[in-house]
């Protein structure tokens, strides 16, 4: 999950992701749709 928010740097990209089972909470976006009901959510 590559994001612009603060997080550990991996190959020059910041990572900040949380796996949600029912989409993403308000203020977050789903950066990778693994399955219809699973969201890899980033701020």
Curated annotation (Swiss-Prot):
Location in or out of the cell: Secreted; Nematocyst
Q: Which SUPFAM superfamilies match?
A: Defensin-like
Q: Write out the entry's keywords from A to Z.
A: Disulfide bond, Ion channel impairing toxin, Nematocyst, Neurotoxin, Secreted, Toxin, Voltage-gated sodium channel impairing toxin
Q: Which domain of life is it from?
A: Eukaryota
Under InterPro entries, the record lists:
Anenome_toxin, Myo_ane_neurotoxin_sf
Q: What is the predominant subcellular site recorded for this chain? A: secreted
Q: Which cysteines are joined by disulfide bonds?
A: 1-41, 3-31, 24-42
Would you name any one GO CC term?
nematocyst
One GO molecular function term of this record is: sodium channel regulator activity
Give an example GO biological process: regulation of signal transduction
Question: What is this protein for, i.e. what is its function?
Answer: Binds specifically to voltage-gated sodium channels (Nav), thereby delaying their inactivation during signal transduction. Thus it strongly stimulates mammalian cardiac muscle contraction.
Q: Which family does it belong to?
A: Belongs to the sea anemone sodium channel inhibitory toxin family. Type I subfamily.
Name of this protein: Delta-actitoxin-Bca1a
